Amino acid sequence: MRPERALARLQGLPLNFDEGAVPHHRWHVDQLSQALPGELPGEPARGGAWRIACRLVEDYRIADPAIVRATWEPGTPLEGRNMLLELRLYRVLRVHAGVRVTRAWDEPRRQDGRRARVFGFEYATLDGHIEMGRMDYEVWKWIDDGAVEFRLHAVSGASGQGPPWTRLGFRLFGRREQLRFYFRCCERIARLTARELGLPDDPPSPAVRVRKADPTQTPEPAANPLPRSSGA
């Protein structure tokens, strides 16, 4: 199916998981943090690192096109946007999958007594996606010292959907490619932000794995809903 038709089909598709579902031993929960070029203390500066990084996130330029490419209807608002993702494995296998932006925010927050400005969005997987779950991307600026960081939070599991060969490929390579995608997002946004600021194209500091709650670490699924990022 042509990408244009596949994108149009996403409009009527539901999510491929129950939003009231609970994580269990087959779900992965990941959270990464990546330091970005900083600013002076205070609210985000016009043309500064925070605003640049926010634009990169909104335009989905954080994704490495060798791993994931995205298409959406130009001019659509961020919240509610349907995105057709092309998942690539070593430039040989390609799978199309749909996601929908279910939330977007640009808000002040307070964490551990510190004030921050936070921009971000969350998308969730649609029917037919080889994975199920949700993922969010955020850009933080700390008001007290001007530090800027990118955060990525994901809760996902295999959906069991798609042709047999895609399910087999996901079982064999999915988790490895998933983590590679996460870390590449962190590296790309750091490099692209620095480049737009005219800074040297040096390798960024490595992303920090803030949270990992894989099978043996995931709490017993009592009554906890599928967790969303709380900004913690």
Regions found by a protein language model. Give the residues of each.
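Hydrophobic ligand-binding cavity/cleft-lining segments
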Residues: 1-94, 219-232
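Hydrophobic, Leu/Ile/Phe/Ala-enriched alpha-helical segments that form helix-helix packing faces
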Residues: 53-64, 105, 185-197
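Hydrophobic-ligand binding "helix-grip"
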Residues: 92-147, 231
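A short, polar/proline- and glycine-enriched secondary-structure boundary/capping micro-motif
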Residues: 96, 134, 159-168
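Short, solvent-exposed aromatic-acidic interface loops
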Residues: 125-129, 152-161
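An amphipathic alpha-helical core segment
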Residues: 140-142, 147, 152-158, 169-170
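A conserved amphipathic terminal alpha-helix motif
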Residues: 166-212, 217-219
